[in-house]
Amino acid sequence: MLRVVLADDQDLFRAGFATILGAEPDIEVVAEAPDGAAAVRAAREHRPDVVLMDMRMPVLDGVAATRQVCALTTSRVLALTMFDTDDYLYAALRAGASGFLLKDAPRADLVNAVRVVAAGDALLAPAVTARVIGELHRRGHPDPARVAAVTALTARETDVLRLIAAGLSNAEIAAHHHLSEHTVKTHVGNLFTKLHLRDRAQAVMVAYESGLVIPGQ
């Protein structure tokens, strides 16, 4: 059973999400929160698999709440936003969010998003990814700390990181290199450990911030 906390300051959205997710036999909404601070408390108390986190909330905004949830728990955060141009997108990924979902997404997409993020995968819609890459391009120069961390990877781990940033799954990376999927999982696990990553969304950020992958190429 996947355990979910809903964090949104609008009652209507929380009720709608709760109804949709509650209809799934493998998903349980264990708590709701009307602001970021309450979301952090709920995550610490209930230890959910996923926190659906609205980005614009009172008391503590979604970015700050995401940072605290990721630091204090093993829960994964799926950020919610009304617009794919939201200025919070980049900051939330930096804070540890595993992906983004637009609030007007079809109900099937909401259910799938929860399952994908709970499984440890990233959920980055093309429009959202483009926005984040655009922000990285605007920043211009690679992050020296990220460069140093990526330099410490083996050649194979570096290549796997590059392919993760390109959106390939473990199975696709295995086929690309004629490796077993188990071997690829080992490489992914090793590079996650070395780079202190929680999931593939963070791996994508590191690949771009280190200059391993260049926006636009």
Question: Over which residues does each language-model region extend?
Answer:
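Active-site residues of response regulator receiver
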Residues: 8, 54, 81
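Acidic catalytic/metal-coordinating carboxylates
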Residues: 35-38, 59-64
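Recognition helix of helix-turn-helix DNA-binding domains
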Residues: 167-202
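Short, flexible helix-to-coil linker/hinge segments that flank and couple to helix-turn-helix
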Residues: 89-94, 99, 104-155, 159, ...
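Short hydrophobic/Thr-rich beta-strand motif most characteristic of the beta2 strand and flanking loop
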Residues: 26-34, 42, 197
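The feature encodes the CheY-like receiver
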Residues: 13, 53, 58
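Active-site beta3 strand of CheY-like receiver
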Residues: 46-52
